[in-house]
Amino acid sequence: MTASSNLADLLEQVSVDRMAVTVAALASDPLAGRRVGSTGGAAARDWLVNRFTAPGADVRTEEFPVRAVPQVYEAPTVTWGEGGRTDELVFGRQVAIHPASADTPNIRRGALAVAGKDDPTGRWLVVPADMSLFDAYRDTNRAAGLLVRRPVDAEGWQFTMLAGPDPGPLPVLTLDPDTHHAVLTAATAGDGWLAGATPLRRDDVTGANIHACLRQPAPAGADLLLTAHYDGVGDHPGLRLPGASDNATGVAVVLEAARVLATALPAGAGLSVALLDGEEVGALGSAHHASQLHAAGAAPMVLNVDGVGRLERAAAVEAGGPAHRLLALLDQAGRHTGIPLVAGPVASDNRRYGGAGFAAVGIGAGMGGYHSPADTPDKVDPATLAAIARLVVATAHLAATAPATLSSSIGDKR
């Protein structure tokens, strides 16, 4: 049997249904968005550990500390008005809490003013769109708080971020563009008021990576590491943030690729999986793992998958470390499977591995509803899951067998 026909058989084994089950499970209500250190994150971890069923698989978890994870512990009540009109803002759509906000559980009411122009005392300062939060803080003496503009997705949701600057001394609320414009207009006219709170605490928690060694590498054999983060930003009170595309899809692809490859790679090729925690708070899980690999003298080739919910034109690929050979193999795999690739940012765990000196490539293929309630399983395209899983299988197969060329069913011209 030729390498080409053997790979064709492997690609046929990729199961979309199996991946869809993984996405649905990780995005389900009981897992509550899978924030690092949460009960939902622990439930996701338990579920994932049980997915490794290959004979002889060595599966373990590795804990690491995570400091100051922001968590909205109560839906904020925010109202504003001008003249005789009063509007209560909808949490998650019109208003949200900035990750750099102080924890202010009690409602503060104050007149509106423009940051950097008006007397800040006792007022909510509206930060113009072209002003940074750093600049807005220059003149905030005894201000009630800050109001900053934040874009929304196609369904009108604001996105949630866990990683960001340290908290400042003031409550900071984010407003959707329309509300921000209306509030800024009122403040410029010397009119209007706002009343709101920012119930946002920061918890020190424990994250945990999941490691599975499916095949030990021979001394001169290829050593492949497939990675994806399983944590999400977590639900808010009254708001579900399922994290289907980000990153239940990446986990589903890695699990499926590992299942197909576990018994199919040639003797001497190593295969491991790392399902990583803490990506949403600064890729801390991969930083922890990369330091362990470096200390152990390991040299795996890393394929990281993050956000593969909907392939539009081409899959984004970002390389780090000594990844020239891995990139060449990925390009060859893309040509063979018919998946167009383009160099583009994949701001994920691959950067931690690349920064630690390992050959690392991140793969992304689009998503809907980034860090919002709109990131649901029904928005995940099954064909995209299949395409990226086949790309990973083909790349790993080529890395293990290392043929000079591989005939493509669609030809090598683009």
Give each language-model segment a name.
Residues 3-39, 55, 60-63, 154-169, ...:
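N-terminal capping segment at the start of a domain
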Residues 5-13, 30-39, 54, 102, ...:
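Second-shell loop/turn segments in exported
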Residues 10, 21, 29-124:
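Noncatalytic luminal/extracellular "stalk/propeptide" segments of secretory-pathway proteins
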Residues 15, 85-171, 337-338:
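Extracellular/luminal Protease-associated
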Residues 18-21, 25, 43, 47-50, ...:
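Extracytoplasmic/secreted proteins, especially bacterial periplasmic and envelope-associated proteins
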Residues 98-112, 159-243, 259, 263, ...:
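Soluble metallo-hydrolase cores and metallopeptidase-like ectodomains found primarily
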Residues 165, 310-414:
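Active-site-adjacent substrate-binding region
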Residues 206-209, 232-326:
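Acidic/histidine-rich catalytic neighborhood of metal-dependent amide-processing enzymes
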